[in-house]
UniProtKB/Swiss-Prot annotation:
Binding site for substrate: Y109
SUPFAM superfamilies the record matches: Pseudouridine synthase
HAMAP family assigned to the protein according to its UniProt record, in alphabetical order: TruA
Function: Formation of pseudouridine at positions 38, 39 and 40 in the anticodon stem and loop of transfer RNAs.
Matches recorded under Pfam families: PseudoU_synth_1
Active-site residue numbers: D51 (nucleophile)
GO molecular function, one term: tRNA pseudouridine(38-40) synthase activity
EC assignment: 5.4.99.12
Protein name as it appears in the record: tRNA pseudouridine synthase A
Gene3D superfamilies recorded: Pseudouridine synthase I, catalytic domain, C-terminal subdomain, Pseudouridine synthase I, catalytic domain, N-terminal subdomain
Keyword terms, alphabetized: Isomerase, tRNA processing
Catalytic reaction(s) noted: uridine(38/39/40) in tRNA = pseudouridine(38/39/40) in tRNA
Organism of origin: Burkholderia cenocepacia (strain HI2424)
Principal EC category: isomerase
Amino acid sequence: MRIALGIQYDGAAFCGWQAQPHGKTVQDRLEHALAEFARVPLHTTVAGRTDTGVHGLGQVVHFDTDLEREVFSWVRGTNAFLPSTVSVQWAKPMPDTFHARFSAFERTYYYALYVHPVRSPMLAGRAGWIHTPLDDDAMRAAAAHLIGEHDFSSFRSSECQSKTPVKHLYQIDVRRAGHFIHFRFRANAFLHHMVRNLMGCLVAVGRGRYPADWLADVLAGRDRNLAAPTFMADGLYLAHVGYPAEFAVPPAQLGSVPWSSVWADLDPQT
């Protein structure tokens, strides 16, 4: 039997998703909890491996098991062995044709950026921060150069294991709400550090360091050295993974973040 799980986690508490020998990753803790509940080792396959500090609101995994359990018991039972920084949100039996990674046709990330002269300790690990004003319109104009199917090598980390740098970026939204600017990135898939590298460039344009069309030159150059430094991970959230309707994957629950009303207006599942 194949079971899919919806996972939420506070990325600030972990060294990324992927299992490591030190055991301080989300995958390590999740698989430990599953093994405690099931009394047998279970290996999970994830929709997208997030980096250290990146949060998960709509992460999806699957695993295979011969065990017979009431479906919701996978939620309740696994959560009993998880720390407060990770939670299984739902469980659903799936056909063998479902694959958490390869069945997904799109991913949506949000970035919450606090724009204020003084940093807030209450937002540590939850939102990015910049102390200088930003030009929203300039960032929107810059983002427009990135929409479409392109070679995103300029925004790819040296550790990226993707077979191709060509991705289709469907949407970048920039929305201001008080002292926050919220960014939404939707694509068929993302390269390692791609969203954080895009953020670094958009913020550089917003600060007036470069004109909006600079980003078109960076994209065309296909050279990571042309782009701005990688932006901080603190405000980055994997919000949604899109699957074909036949799998009826439950929607991500965004209400667990304080700016969920702003994100709801942007609607990550359209």
